[in-house]
Design a protein with these regions (language model features):
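Alpha-helical segment proximal to the catalytic Tyr-Lys
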Residues: 129, 173-177
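Active-site helix of classical SDR
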Residues: 116, 124, 160, 168
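Residue(s) in the substrate-gating loop at a strand-loop-helix junction
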Residues: 144
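Active-site loop-to-helix junction immediately N-terminal to the catalytic Tyr of the SDR YXXXK motif
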Residues: 105, 150-158, 170
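Short, small/polar-rich loop/turn modules that mediate ligand/substrate recognition or access, typified
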Residues: 176, 181, 236-237
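Substrate-binding pocket helix/loop in short-chain dehydrogenase/reductase
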Residues: 101-102, 108-111, 206
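C-terminal substrate-recognition "lid" of short-chain dehydrogenase/reductases
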Residues: 136, 214-242, 247
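Conserved glycine-rich cofactor-binding loop
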Residues: 21-22
Length: 249
């Protein structure tokens, strides 16, 4: 379902953010709205949170989709066209993980993570067709530092995030000659609901690995995304790390 919350001026650029209801996604929605964009907040299970984001942003709307289901991805793109009439920026932020060491990991757990990665690829493919009709667009993929460093108990997740950065590089080359820019932002450990639940000893070990000595804020990631979605006219195929110096690429 999609719902228009209000109307913006004619010709407003439209940004669609998957996983836009909480954490980094929420901050990205707010940052893009601050740049004058109309934002589509895409969620799967956090309807109340998605509506709270949209309610605070001019012209924002919400849409629900399980990206692991190709039929729902197709329905989402149709909804976006009906509600907004255009998409100028796609931020692939939705992420999913099931932590377990390899011998405890079930095939269903792996498939759930891989299914979301496939859905991100499929959504990107469908939105790209709209971009090509409009002769331009911006894609920003939210990957992760662990896609580069690895992390215990997160093999499917690290594979998915590393693959997302590989997709960024390959797709940027495929879009040669078109005004379609594709980049990744790879956050480190960011203060979100996910990291808030870490045990104190784990949090301490993480902070010891970060030269800046603290976790990042969602807004710090969102500002980089907003730059790539707006002013970055000569950046494509890049992975930009936002991790406090934990990893340099």
């Amino acid at each position: 379902m999609s719902e228009v919350r209000s109307e913006t001026g004619p010709g407003a650029r439209v940004a669609v953010v998957t996983g836009g209801a909480t954490g980094i996604g929420r901050a990205v929605c707010q940052a893009l709205a601050a740049k004058g964009m109309r934002v589509g907040v895409v969620y799967n299970s956090s309807e109340a949170a998605a509506r709270s984001v949209a309610d605070g942003l001019p012209g924002a709307f919400v849409a629900r989709a399980d990206l692991g289901d190709p039929a729902q991805v197709e329905a989402l793109v149709k909804q976006l066209q009906e509600v907004a009439g255009r998409v100028d920026v796609l931020v692939n932020n939705a992420g999913y993980n099931r932590d377990a060491p390899i011998f405890s990991m079930k095939i269903d757990d792996y498939d759930a993570v891989a299914g979301l990665a496939r859905g991100t690829w499929y959504l990107t493919k469908l939105v790209l067709r709209r971009f090509m009709l409009r002769s331009g667009g911006r894609i920003v993929n939210i990957s992760s530092v662990v896609g580069h460093t690895g992390n215990v108990g997160q093999i499917p997740y690290t594979m998915a995030k590393a693959g997302l950065d590989a997709m960024t590089r390959s797709l940027a080359q495929e879009m040669q000659g078109r005004d379609i820019l594709v980049n990744s932002v790879a956050p480190g450990f960011i203060d979100t609901d996910m990291t808030a639940g870490l045990p104190d000893e784990v949090r301490t070990r993480i902070l010891e690995r970060i030269p800046l000595g603290r976790m990042g804020r969602p807004e710090e990631v969102a500002e980089v995304v907003a730059f790539l979605a707006t002013a970055a006219s000569y950046v494509t195929g890049s992975v930009i790390h936002v991790n406090g110096g934990m990893y340099g690429g």
